[in-house]
């Protein structure tokens, strides 16, 4: 599909920018639609960047009218379980309503191929491990519910007007581009690995451990971490697989779980620096254990994670952090 024109919403964000780079390397003509509220123009070198919000249907329609996109990769949205518990309406507006706006414009312009960012949070507190795509969704946070509503919308659009889609259910994205030119830069930061690395680098006084009484071997939550470059490769595979009217749901993970305390110890080993931690109460909406089966991505998309050692994932994140201690704009 070299030369195919693609729209990537939220393409200046963490996972989006890594995917944009890979798609461009593969010959796709990539246009980015991003309001830059959390994304960074520097991450995409400002190339073919439309600064706009999905809620602005006029700007969105004009982009489709002018560029004649063949497919869309949809990253735009907000993604914090904790914040969604405090501000649920933000999540229904930014995730659900804005995806609705995108789908309306896609339908109007007869664009029937979509790869969308979903989330492991749709599963809630799983009743089986590893989690399969057929596991019953039961989200426990507004963020997870917003992602499940989006999946329902996609299924209805597939039935009504032939939308073809792949919904990629990420587990915990981590790491950075191996060459250190792209990485994680959130304000405020909420992800475990960059927070731990900031403590190691002396940029934060301590790391909060939210919940140490979970039913896990060391009492801390267990998560399945997947490298951001592997996520980008999965989006490429999904884009090349998708056909109008077809639907696919895929977990993206490594299939191995790591506890919060294990992650902190690995960060200390990678950096050679101590990380002070303070135990805090559990956060609402945090399941104790999330580990995935990735058989669907493997058998249907031909995707395998290349980064299966969490230490190696953390090493790429540390390389980014050392070369960009204050992110893109202030390194």
Cite the ranges covered by each PLM segment.
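Short capping/connector residues at structural and topological boundaries
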Residues: 41, 49, 86, 90, ...
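C-terminal substrate-binding subdomain of Rossmann-fold SDR/epimerase-dehydratase oxidoreductases
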Residues: 195-331
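N-terminal Rossmann-like NAD(P)+-binding domain of SDR-like oxidoreductases, especially those catalyzing
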Residues: 1-176
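Short-chain dehydrogenase/reductase
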Residues: 92, 140-148, 182, 186-194, ...
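Glycosyltransferase donor-binding loop in the core domain
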Residues: 55, 76-79, 91, 188, ...
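Short, flexible, glycine-rich and Lys/Arg-enriched loop motifs at helix boundaries
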Residues: 41, 171-192, 202-223
